[in-house]
Amino acid sequence: MESLGATVKKPGSTVKNKTGSWRTFKPVLDKDKCIDCDNCILFCPEGCINREHEIDYDYCKGCGICAEKCPVKAIKMEREK
């Protein structure tokens, strides 16, 4: 089976309803560790990470997939304050 990569251009399926308030943990990127592999962008189910690796916290639900898929552990999940 062949797979095709894709990214979501707009965050979330409901642009009008910001869903970031659902989070318990949020991803925090250490840009010094980042190797620009773009796994975080490709695997984010909400499309909350842009090409500059900025995270749109208005829509990020804190699922942690970006941190899990980062090969150099440049993304850490931190508890919301």
Curated annotation (Swiss-Prot):
Gene encoding this polypeptide?
porD
Q: Does the keyword Endoplasmic reticulum apply?
A: no
| Lineage: superkingdom | Archaea
How, per the record, is the cofactor bound?
Binds 2 [4Fe-4S] clusters.
Q: Which residues bind [4Fe-4S] cluster 1?
A: 34, 37, 40, 70
Protein name as catalogued: Pyruvate synthase subunit PorD
* GO-annotated molecular function: 4 iron, 4 sulfur cluster binding; metal ion binding; oxidoreductase activity, acting on the aldehyde or oxo group of donors, iron-sulfur protein as acceptor
Question: Does the keyword Repressor feature in the UniProt annotation?
Answer: no
Instruction: Specify one Pfam family.
Output: Fer4_21
Q: Which residues form the 4Fe-4S ferredoxin-type domain?
A: 25-50, 51-80
Q: Which cofactor does it need?
A: [4Fe-4S] cluster
Its keywords, alphabetically, are:
4Fe-4S, Electron transport, Iron, Iron-sulfur, Metal-binding, Repeat, Transport
Q: Note the subunit structure.
A: Heterotetramer of one alpha, one beta, one delta and one gamma chain.
Write out the residues that bind [4Fe-4S] cluster 2. 44, 60, 63, 66
